Amino acid sequence: LDDAASDGVKEQWYAFRNDRHGDKDLHQLPSSWKSSIYLLDPANKEWQAYIAERNDEVYSSFDFDGYQIDQLGSRGDLYDYSGSKLNLPRGYASFIDAMKQRHPQKRLVMNAVGSYGASQIAGSGKVDFCYNELWGDEADFSHLHSVIKANDNYSSHSLRTVFAAYM
């Protein structure tokens, strides 16, 4: 959110479109919404601790059985605050591991949008199933079949696949 700093989110946690931390990556939303969605570095340990604390608050107030982590698919080249290139799929695995360590009894899943990061997500060994959100260029049965086979391979034949379906 535009005002995330007021809640304790640090500038150093964001994902940036250049190596000079001058342009935060974001998903632009209409001006009628509270804010656009800003992306953070999923491998940043301070961000992981911060969001895990927010999950603590949610779990203490609501009887949720788990957490669905979301992403936006491939974002092109992104950088951390110090100018190092991010490896988002590797960051996803780190984030998943941190969330599972914090709440080992809770279920966990992460959306592999367009199968981006699916290998690292399924290969983390910490999600309950493979979850894929496919788009228009992946609308054929052959695409679904390919994703199921790939996910089966990524998870060493241990996880089933669920697809997001929008009507």
PLM segments and residue spans:
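Glycan-recognition surfaces
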Residues: 8, 13-29, 102-167
